[in-house]
């Protein structure tokens, strides 16, 4: 692209300068001629026939914008005052138009997301359990010209139904003669009996139920031969699950011989891929390490989780020490307060001598010194 000519660039600069000068002139004219500039803008209303500036005392009338409804008893006129400002007004006199109220469909519910149904708001539909939404589940209130309306029709709630579940090779399911299953109706799969030493195992969920419209709870299982090899642990022995053939979900537990310890899990389960889960453990010679590396914990059917029901013994030691210190300090404060209370209780209040009333005839009586007082017993 060729660079712009110097003449074009200079012309554009002149137009910018001219626009700025005109804008400044408008403001200067308004200030010098005791006039107001453009009236304040509002979100819900706009001025009727606006002008560049208004003289003092001149009024501008507002009207509601498209999509807003005029409310009575609200001021819609602003006046240019002597200080070049406008009498403050608000656009509370114009409110958003509302779409019609939508009733929930039979067996359904309706929820207005913002609690209102003005244009821009959304309404959401849902159905009770056992039914599904047929149609648009969410509608929005839209502005169309000067009016508002929903962008679609209210959906319906239809009954959840399922077609028959998938058939499986070398297996079957119950209620195979039923063509339509209702919500939460279930079937149970099983494998056919076969000739030979190896039986068929049902791999997957045995029970399936109609969980949604044309949707079963899970994929159909399969019937196949699952056979894991004989589990052998050197320097160890089996203590449960003894046998010569190990089919799907067979569980075996091992024990190391004296002087050996486990490296791995002591319990394994025959998985659907003909391997043991987790892998076969080892029995290593020597004392068990104080802090051995923890093997990963697997949760397979029939395999217990060693953490279930066990309190976490790895409690932080510093937290325990802190709790003990807090308890000791609290006990010391209690004892100190008790001692001070008993000390104050033991102290008796100072005895106050009773006031002696002096009569008028005693005021002029002579004062006897201790040496002149006679013992009445010596008389």
Curated annotation (Swiss-Prot):
One of its GO terms (cellular component) is cell surface. Preferentially expressed in testis. It is found in: Membrane. Glycans are attached at residues 83, 114, 263, 290, 293. Disulfide bonds join 36-80, 64-94, 99-141, 127-157, 162-210, 191-223, 228-270, 256-283. Residues 338-379 are cytoplasmic. Residues 36-96, 97-159, 160-225, 226-285 form the Sushi domain. Keywords: Disulfide bond, Fertilization, Glycoprotein, Membrane, Repeat, Signal, Sushi, Transmembrane, Transmembrane helix. GO terms for biological process: single fertilization. The keyword Thylakoid does not apply. Residues 36-316 are extracellular. The chain crosses the membrane at residues 317-337. It is a single-pass type I membrane protein. Residues 1-35 form the signal peptide. CDD domains: CCP (cd00033). PANTHER family: COMPLEMENT COMPONENT-RELATED SUSHI DOMAIN-CONTAINING (PTHR19325), MEMBRANE COFACTOR PROTEIN (PTHR19325:SF521). Interacts with C3b. Interacts with C4b. Interacts with moesin/MSN. May be involved in the fusion of the spermatozoa with the oocyte during fertilization. This is Membrane cofactor protein. It comes from Cavia porcellus (Guinea pig). The lineage of its organism: Eukaryota, Metazoa, Chordata, Craniata, Vertebrata.
């Amino acid at each position: 692209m060729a660079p712009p000519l110097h003449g074009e660039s200079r012309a554009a600069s002149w137009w910018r300068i001219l626009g700025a000068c005109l804008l400044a002139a408008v403001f200067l004219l308004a200030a010098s001629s005791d006039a107001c500039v453009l009236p304040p803008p509002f979100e819900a209303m706009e001025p009727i026939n606006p002008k560049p500036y208004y003289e003092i005392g001149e009024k501008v009338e507002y009207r509601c914008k498209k999509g807003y409804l005029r409310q009575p008893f609200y001021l819609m006129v602003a006046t240019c005052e002597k200080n070049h400002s406008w009498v403050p007004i608000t656009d509370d006199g114009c409110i958003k138009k509302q779409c019609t109220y939508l009733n929930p469909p039979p067996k359904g519910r309706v929820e207005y997301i913002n609690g209102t149904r003005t244009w821009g708001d959304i309404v959401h539909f849902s159905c009770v359990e056992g039914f599904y939404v047929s149609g648009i589940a969410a509608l929005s209130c839209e502005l169309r010209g000067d009016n508002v309306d929903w962008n679609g029709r209210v959906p319906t709630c239809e009954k959840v139904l399922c077609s028959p579940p998938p058939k499986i090779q070398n297996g079957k399911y119950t209620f195979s003669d039923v063509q339509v299953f209702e919500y939460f109706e279930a079937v149970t799969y099983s494998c056919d009996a076969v000739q030979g030493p190896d039986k068929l195992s049902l791999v997957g969920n045995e029970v399936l139920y109609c969980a949604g419209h044309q949707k079963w709870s899970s994929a159909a299982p399969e019937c196949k031969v699952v056979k894991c090899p004989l589990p052998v642990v050197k320097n160890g022995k089996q203590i449960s699950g003894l046998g010569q053939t190990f089919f799907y979900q067979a569980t075996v537990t091992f024990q190391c011989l004296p002087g050996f310890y486990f490296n791995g899990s002591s319990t394994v389960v025959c998985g659907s891929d003909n391997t043991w889960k987790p892998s076969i453990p080892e029995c290593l010679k020597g004392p068990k390490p104080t802090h051995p590396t923890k093997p990963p914990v697997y949760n397979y059917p029939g395999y217990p989780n060693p953490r279930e029901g066990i309190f976490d013994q790895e409690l932080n030691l510093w937290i325990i020490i802190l709790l003990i210190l807090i308890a000791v300090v609290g006990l010391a404060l209690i004892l100190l307060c008790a001692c001070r209370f008993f000390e104050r209780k033991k102290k008796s209040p100072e005895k106050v001598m009773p006031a002696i009333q002096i009569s008028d005839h005693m005021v002029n009586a002579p004062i006897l010194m201790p040496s002149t007082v006679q013992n009445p017993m010596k008389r």
